[in-house]
């Protein structure tokens, strides 16, 4: 197999603050379940744009994604950050909090385990793994850990950054950090918004 070393993989992009937007010659994969937002991201020659959701429970299935289109946000004078408030198989809590379920768009999407995405795209090294899935980040990382434990540590992402805000269970965040520290990661920061960890062990091919 011809493995590919990636500069980044980002899971859950919306259409702002993305790695693909700042990428020029980098190799990457940008994964987003909302096609409306994925299509608004720039096309880069070395970056794959994948329209799917990364499964929280490692099961492949058909699903629905709940989101707001930008024109509906503007027409209803809603805050712009709602572009990033999307949810799998249910309304986002902001949709309910703001009483805007009537303008939420719902579309079908495929949920795919992260390990399958990595294998299908011949992924080996990953310099940066960025996850922002509105509450599912720790579940994805726990699934990823099982995959990584079957590989040499050359497959371990060098940097992992994931969302750890009010949508995240603090106990789950802490247990995820501890599990990755056991793999050789060192916590750089966890500030109530995001958590960042760096892999510190020397690479081993086997």
What are these regions (language model features)?
Residues 77-78, 167-173:
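Short, flexible/disordered intra-domain loops and linkers
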Residues 46-115:
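S-adenosyl-L-methionine
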Residues 1-6, 87-151, 168-171:
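Short internal loop-to-helix segment that lines adenine-nucleotide cofactor pockets
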Residues 154-164:
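Conserved beta-strand signature within the Rossmann-like core of class I S-adenosyl-L-methionine
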